[in-house]
A protein has these predicted regions:
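C-terminal transmembrane helical hairpin of 12-TM major facilitator-type secondary transporters
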Residues: 287-331
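Cytoplasmic helix-loop-helix junction between adjacent transmembrane helices
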Residues: 109-147
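Symmetry-related core transmembrane helices of the 12-TM Major Facilitator Superfamily/SLC fold
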Residues: 170-188, 377-394
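Conserved MFS/SLC helix-loop-helix module at the cytosolic interface between two early adjacent transmembrane helices
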Residues: 64-101, 281-284
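Central cavity-lining transmembrane alpha-helices of secondary-active solute carriers
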Residues: 54-70, 265-276
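Short amphipathic helix-loop junctions that connect adjacent transmembrane helices
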Residues: 33-49, 241-257
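Juxtamembrane intracellular "pre-TM" segments in multi-pass secondary transporters
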Residues: 1-9, 194-225, 408-420
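Hydrophobic core of transmembrane alpha-helices in multi-pass small-molecule transporters
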Residues: 93, 104-118, 312-326
Length: 420
């Protein structure tokens, strides 16, 4: 592993935190203001609900074939280059969305999103390689909070621009494009190259297929990816339709964004709570906190379908964001501590493979369910997360040391090894 001496884990974490924050800010604005943008380019209001779900699936579908390739390219050649690539493509995506004048142009912009993804797992792998083991839970918790904080800031800033400055949503995405260019410059100047403990050799395709096969060979990884994938299906159902729920509860039209801004602030508050999950997991264990966070997420989705006002919706959604962020941090920490070094980097690079499947499946299910009523989407999302909860409990009981016949006192004191 080669790390620039002047850049310890604190500085690398800070740079990657900013990178993830800005990406979350821009992506959240696509989720929050996609209804606005659709109406601005001429889509009838009656068609917006179905198109939101279909475009949400398109968001991830285009990038699915590249998932294993980004990680292989990063480990074989340069993690830094792959991360900078993501920021530059973000700038192009947000620029196209900002400049769109017709629905087909907006569709093209959404297709390009698939080429910007694939950086989060690479950043997590680099953080894992430079962070001391006893600070890993905290580091992963802090990093996991960056994207949700961006997700909260994006709608808040965008709502201010649209309602107070009377700008179109195109200007919102133009600012996101400029911020992404700034991130690319920041990484190029300020970040060092962190090489994996084991640098892969061989052809790109062989390594990519090998990384995917490696996931299937490890029971812990299989369980975690299934659990995470089911959580993401429910999460993406709710996230894709959150803006529409806000407008429904607040009884506002799609061209008004004032109610979306406070939801963004709720996301910020929820994300700010999430590092506490990392701290608690260092004390109690990753498995326990994972199960608790998934249970909390299912309850919040039910509550979101029942709340009578935007204020209560803000509160509940903030709690949902905290739970979602903690789930991600716990999955990352379990993979970082329990996967062997020779496969750890490849596994972390693929950590958002479940996000792609959830991102395709969740909005597609939502597009089918929304015909029965908007709140039905959130009830179904809660049911999906409840399935993930059952799987998480089974994972915790079947993959821990006690389930494998290993005495607890014979193991080093690692929180991830404690079972329910």
């Amino acid at each position: 592993m080669k790390v620039r001496p002047s850049q310890d884990w604190h500085s690398l974490l800070a740079l990657y935190w900013i990178t993830s924050f800005v990406e979350g800010l821009g992506v959240s604005q696509i989720f929050a203001f996609l209804p606005n943008r659709l109406t601005e380019v001429g889509v009838p209001s009656a068609d917006v609900g179905h198109l939101v779900g279909l475009l949400g699936s398109l968001f991830f579908l285009s990038g699915l074939p590249f998932i294993p390739l980004w990680g292989v390219w990063a480990d074989k050649y340069s993690r830094k280059a792959v991360i900078i690539r993501s920021a530059l493509v973000e700038a192009v995506v947000f620029g196209v969305v900002a400049a769109s004048q017709a629905p087909w142009q907006l569709f093209v912009g959404m297709m390009l999103v698939g080429f910007q993804l694939g950086n989060t797992g690479v950043m997590m792998a680099a953080i894992r390689d430079v962070t001391p083991g006893h600070r890993l839970g905290l580091a992963m918790g802090l990093f996991a909070a960056s994207s949700p904080l961006g997700f909260g800031t994006g709608p808040a800033v965008g709502g201010l621009m649209i309602d107070q400055l009377h700008l179109s949503s195109g200007y919102v995405f133009a600012v996101a494009a400029l911020l992404s260019i700034g991130v690319a410059l920041m990484l190029a100047i300020g970040s060092g190259e962190v090489r994996p403990e084991v640098v892969p050799t061989g052809s790109i395709l062989r390594l990519a297929f090998g990384a995917v096969r490696g996931l299937m060979a490890d029971p812990t990884v299989r369980w975690l990816f299934v659990v995470y994938g089911v959580v993401f299906i429910g999460r993406q159902m709710a996230t894709q339709y959150m803006t529409l729920l806000v407008h429904a509860v607040d009884h506002t039209a799609f061209d008004v964004s004032g109610a979306v801004g406070p939801v963004g602030l709720a996301v910020i508050a929820g994300a700010a709570l999430s590092p506490a999950g990392g701290w608690i997991s260092d004390k109690l264990g990753f498995r326990q906190v994972l199960v608790g966070a998934i249970a909390g997420l299912a309850l919040t989705f039910v509550a979101m379908a029942l709340v009578p006002s935007v204020i209560w919706l803000d509160v509940v959604y903030g709690l949902a964001i905290a739970c979602m962020t903690i789930v991600g941090a716990m999955v990352s920490s379990l993979l970082a501590t329990e996967v062997p070094a020779q496969r750890r980097s490849a596994t972390l690079n693929l950590i958002y493979l479940p996000l792609y499947f959830g991102g395709i499946t969740g909005p597609a299910i939502g597009a089918g369910v929304v015909g029965a009523g908007l709140r039905a989407v959130f009830y179904v999302a809660a049911g999906v997360v409840a399935v993930a909860l059952i799987l998480a409990v089974a994972f915790a009981r079947r993959t821990g040391p006690a389930a494998q016949g290993v005495a607890e006192d014979s193991l080093p004191p690692r929180p991830a090894d404690r079972v329910l």
